[in-house]
């Protein structure tokens, strides 16, 4: 049975609805990125789904379509701020900033996961990136944005293979940390090795 990815957007059909998702909560290095997207229900882009279920090539293609056709915004919280305030608070801050950066103010904000926000517009949906088109679109924008940032950082620190692992704790990444130590972009609050 196919899921209606517009179910939640239809539920709030009289409201401006944004979806929000993040990329980079679990990596050992780099920022956390949150993106907010307001889908135009009159212009549905086909193929949008959770970024983790798409090839890199398909994500890149959809990123270009989403950012060309929908209202969107992104926020980036650095690895140092993650260390200062913790990953959960950094993620929530990125989500709030991304919504504030939208050129159109949403009345409802659909959030992937179970994070709770003081802002009453925020509605948490567990597994939201599989249940909401807006959240799925945001997951693509966040993932592509973060992957591009990590690719840029990989040029400066190629030994950590961030161009392949995006800062996640792969075997090769942990081996590189054991050999070279932590880079300036590693999260000090994350214990890995």
Curated annotation (Swiss-Prot):
InterPro entries, alphabetized: RNase_HII, RNase_HII/HIII, RNase_HII/HIII_dom, RNaseH-like_sf, RNaseH_sf
Domain of life of the native organism: Bacteria
Domain RNase H type-2 intervals: 15-193
Key words of the record: Cytoplasm, Endonuclease, Hydrolase, Manganese, Metal-binding, Nuclease
Keyword Manganese included in the entry's annotation: yes
CDD domains: RNase_HII_bacteria_HII_like (cd07182)
Cofactor annotation comment: Manganese or magnesium. Binds 1 divalent metal ion per monomer in the absence of substrate. May bind a second metal ion after substrate binding.
EC top class, as a word: hydrolase
One Gene Ontology cellular component annotation held by this UniProt entry: cytoplasm
Gene3D superfamilies, sorted: Ribonuclease H-like superfamily/Ribonuclease H (3.30.420.10)
Catalytic reaction list: Endonucleolytic cleavage to 5'-phosphomonoester
NCBIfam families in the record: PRK00015.1-1, PRK00015.1-3
UniProt record similarity statement: Belongs to the RNase HII family.
Functional note: Endonuclease that specifically degrades the RNA of RNA-DNA hybrids.
Protein name: Ribonuclease HII
Organism this protein belongs to: Rickettsia africae (strain ESF-5)
